[in-house]
């Protein structure tokens, strides 16, 4: 173990005597090095603050000159926080004594992490009320600094259910109607977490029932997450709001602080008069809650109970609230339509499958196709069908969800990428199942695979049309890899000549986009790289793949294309020791003696321990023109401007 690691470990374990021994007599420069970041990204001071070792913290700052602002990486709840200062780590862990010590020694109370999280937010996250009071009350920590998502300290306190912290922040003037980057408010966070008491507290401070970026009210948010207590309160109860300062916190005065005037019991309005819920909103909330009971809670009887109440409200007082007529019935939903009468609703008791379709229909109508939950639960229902062996229903539902995602989400959305990967894994399983069972297995048709492959190419086209190209994006590389896996599977399915032509047209569309993955890899580079195999949890295709390479070459892939290190696909095939693929590339016109950025040919990259070299004879493919080009390059003969441009490009190839 080196000295730097030993110092870090001593600080981590709170072993002050050992730390003093290790650092005693060191010069300033050596101390700076030893107190810097270790390989994991943290500093000795940062980890000591994280672990609450007050004596170690004060020794490192007072005697060793450690900076109280030096940030690094620290781990909390399985997550790595980048750019965290020591005060943030101590606040997140609830070490009040360390927090006091660091602030006395000059730490900035509002210094943020890389994601713009403050020490106050860190304390709010895990419910450290004493730290929150100290940061705000003694050091005037800014309540309104939001993280990179626009999420404030009040919002995270509400989401985590820390009632007393939320109460304290409101008393200190936290903005109750502040909106995040996605448009949600603290009320949304209460609704999503089921914190009814905090929700009542916020309403007492005149919180407004706003819609977020998806058009969701807190009422709908509670329905989506299945918090019946919130839904019931918002649509039915009419209590006075909870007093903000019914029992004043020590050292605090009136409930009107920094502009927040929250209700006392005498002046509180009934809920229905200050934030009335319309009959239509209540109906939709109950219908959506029922859908949540079907898919999330798997409680069909509970769902029926909520749907009955919604139906009663629709018919209440003789003024029927009609459901909008669907523009067309959906094959994926088995052409189901929503029930509109109490009799139709009661008939669902005998048909659980129809109930599940009702849940999907209701969710799509109320949330709309752009809400993530809409496509998520369609995919979930498809997965349940697949688990029971009903692959056809699964494929229909997943295709419908994929169309919905591509029409409503941004290109390369993680949800869309997940859909493509799920398709690839399902198709791989079905083909293996068919191979094992023969005629008893499901017939996976060309149209199923081809349809998804075409949508995958469309996703790449959409991504490349964005103002900012995806470049070396890991998500973009994964999208290309999944397309190659789908092509790999498609090669296992028999095709008619017209289907073969359609397949080649689609691959040509992909190549025409000229997409580039990691390190500038073209699809042909990726097809000859073993890393392309690792695309998900389950194996789909195996790469390098000769079949995929041949299809790409047949459709016009350039065998001499270069990545960022000037490697051709031939170089990558050589690194992966694939002589058969190398032969195919050479037959397609790849230059055997083309060199990369390190002046290596593909032949020189072959593993000498394997027999691959004996099957590839470079001199069978090297021309006199190639030898002349290499001689010019090797001897540094000036040629630019003296020969035609085509010849210049040829020499540069070598």
UniProtKB/Swiss-Prot annotation:
Pathway: Protein modification; protein ubiquitination. ANK repeats lie at residues 2-31, 40-70, 82-111, 115-145, 149-178, 182-211, 214-243, 519-561, 565-594. SMART domains: ANK. The keyword tRNA processing does not apply. GO terms for biological process: negative regulation of inflammatory response; positive regulation of inflammatory response; protein ubiquitination; regulation of ubiquitin-protein transferase activity; ubiquitin-dependent protein catabolic process via the C-end degron rule pathway. Phosphorylated; highly phosphorylated in myoblasts and myotubes. Phosphorylation at Ser-108 and Ser-608 promote PGE2-EP4-mediated inhibition of inflammation. Dephosphorylated by protein phosphatase 2A (PP2A). Disruption phenotype: No visible phenotype in normal conditions: mice are fertile and develop normally without any apparent malformation. In mice model of chronic inflammation, mice develop more severe colitis induced by dextran sodium sulfate (DSS). Mice display less microglial accumulation; decreased microglial activation is observed in the brain after systemic lipopolysaccharide administration. Mice also show behavioral abnormalities, possibly caused by monoamine deficits. Mice display reduced anxiety-like behavior and brain inflammation in a model of Alzheimer disease. TPR repeats lie at residues 283-317, 375-408. Preferentially expressed in cardiac muscle, brain and liver (at protein level). Also expressed in skeletal muscle. GO terms for molecular function: ubiquitin-like ligase-substrate adaptor activity. It is found in: Mitochondrion; Cytoplasm. Keywords: ANK repeat, Cytoplasm, Mitochondrion, Phosphoprotein, Repeat, TPR repeat, Ubl conjugation pathway. Residues 242-265 are annotated as: Disordered. It holds the Pfam family Ank_2. Residues 253-263 have a biased composition (Polar residues). InterPro entries: Ankyrin_rpt, Ankyrin_rpt-contain_sf, TPR-like_helical_dom_sf. The modification Phosphoserine is found at residues 108, 608. GO terms for cellular component: Cul2-RING ubiquitin ligase complex; mitochondrion. Changing residue 608 to A: Decreased ability to promote PGE2-EP4-mediated inhibition of inflammation. Induction: Up-regulated in ischemic hearts. Belongs to the fem-1 family. Substrate-recognition component of a Cul2-RING (CRL2) E3 ubiquitin-protein ligase complex of the DesCEND (destruction via C-end degrons) pathway, which recognizes a C-degron located at the extreme C terminus of target proteins, leading to their ubiquitination and degradation. The C-degron recognized by the DesCEND pathway is usually a motif of less than ten residues and can be present in full-length proteins, truncated proteins or proteolytically cleaved forms. Component of a CRL2 E3 ubiquitin-protein ligase complex, also named ECS (Elongin BC-CUL2/5-SOCS-box protein) complex, composed of CUL2, Elongin BC (ELOB and ELOC), RBX1 and substrate-specific adapter FEM1A. Interacts with PTGER4. Interacts with NFKB1; the interaction is direct. This is Protein fem-1 homolog A-A. It comes from Mus musculus.
């Amino acid at each position: 173990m080196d000295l730097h690691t030993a110092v870090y470990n001593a600080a981590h374990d709170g072993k002050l005597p050992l730390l003093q021994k290790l650092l005693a007599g060191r010069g300033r420069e050596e101390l700076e090095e030893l107190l810097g970041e270790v390989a994991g990204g943290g500093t000795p001071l940062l980890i000591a603050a994280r672990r609450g070792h007050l004596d170690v913290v004060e020794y490192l700052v007072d005697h060793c000159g450690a900076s109280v602002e030096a940030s690094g990486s620290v781990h909390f709840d399985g997550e790595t926080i980048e750019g965290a200062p020591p005060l943030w780590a101590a606040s997140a862990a609830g070490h009040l004594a360390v927090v006091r010590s660091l602030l006395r020694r000059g730490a900035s109370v509002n210094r943020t992490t890389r994601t713009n999280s403050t020490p106050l937010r860190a304390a709010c996250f895990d419910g450290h009320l004493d730290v929150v009071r100290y940061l705000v009350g003694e050091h005037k920590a800014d309540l309104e600094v939001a993280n990179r998502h626009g999420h404030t300290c009040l919002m995270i306190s509400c989401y985590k259910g820390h009632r007393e912290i939320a109460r304290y922040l409101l008393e200190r003037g936290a903005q109750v109607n502040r909106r995040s980057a996605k448009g949600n408010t603290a009320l949304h966070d209460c609704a999503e977490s089921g914190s009814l008491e905090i929700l009542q507290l916020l309403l007492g401070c005149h919180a407004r029932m706003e819609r977020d970026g998806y058009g969701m009210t807190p009422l709908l948010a509670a329905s989506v997450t299945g918090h019946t207590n919130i839904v019931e309160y918002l649509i039915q109860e009419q209590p006075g709001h909870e007093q903000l300062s019914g029992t004043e916190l020590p050292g605090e005065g009136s409930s009107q602080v920094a502009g927040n005037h929250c209700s006392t019991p005498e002046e509180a309005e009934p809920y229905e008069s200050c934030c009335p819920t319309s009959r239509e909103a209540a109906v939709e909330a109950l219908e959506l809650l029922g859908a949540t009971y079907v898919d999330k809670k798997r409680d069909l009887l509970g769902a029926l109970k909520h749907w009955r109440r919604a139906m009663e409200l629709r018919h209440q007082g003789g003024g029927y609230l009609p459901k909008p007529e669907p523009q067309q019935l959906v094959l994926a939903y088995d052409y189901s339509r929503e029930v509109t009468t109490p009799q139709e609703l009661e008939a669902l008791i005998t048909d659980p499958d129809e109930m599940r379709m009702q849940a999907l229909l209701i969710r799509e109508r109320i949330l709309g196709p752009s809400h993530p939950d809409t496509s998520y639960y369609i995919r979930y229902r498809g997965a349940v069908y697949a688990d029971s062996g009903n692959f056809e229903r699964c494929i229909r539902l997943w295709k419908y969800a994929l169309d919905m995602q591509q029409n409503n989400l941004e290109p390369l959305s993680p949800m869309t990428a997940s859909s493509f990967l799920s398709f690839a894994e399902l198709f791989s399983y079905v083909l293996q199942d068919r191979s094992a069972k023969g005629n008893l297995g499901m017939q996976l048709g060309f149209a199923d695979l081809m349809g998804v492959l075409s949508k995958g190419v469309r996703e790449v086209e959409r991504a490349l049309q964005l103002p900012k190209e995806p470049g070396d994006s890991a998500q973009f590389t994964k999208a290309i890899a999944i397309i190659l896996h789908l092509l790999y599977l498609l090669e296992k399915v028999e095709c008619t000549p017209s289907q073969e032509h359609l397949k080649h047209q689609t691959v040509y569309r992909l190549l025409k986009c000229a997409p580039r993955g990691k390190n500038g890899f073209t699809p042909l580079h990726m097809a000859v790289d073993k890393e392309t195999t690792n695309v998900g949890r389950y194996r789909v295709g195996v790469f390098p793949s000769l079949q995929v390479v041949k299809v790409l070459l047949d459709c016009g892939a350039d065998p001499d294309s270069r990545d960022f290190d000037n490697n051709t696909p031939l170089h990558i095939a050589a690194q992966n020791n694939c002589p058969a693929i190398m032969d195919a590339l050479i037959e397609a016109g790849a230059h055997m003696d083309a060199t990369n950025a390190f002046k290596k040919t593909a032949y020189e990259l072959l593993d000498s321990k394997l027999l691959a070299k004996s099957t590839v004879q470079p001199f069978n493919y090297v021309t006199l023109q190639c030898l002349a080009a290499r001689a010019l390059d090797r001897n540094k003969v000036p040629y630019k401007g003296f020969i035609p441009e085509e010849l210049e490009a040829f020499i540069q190839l070598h």
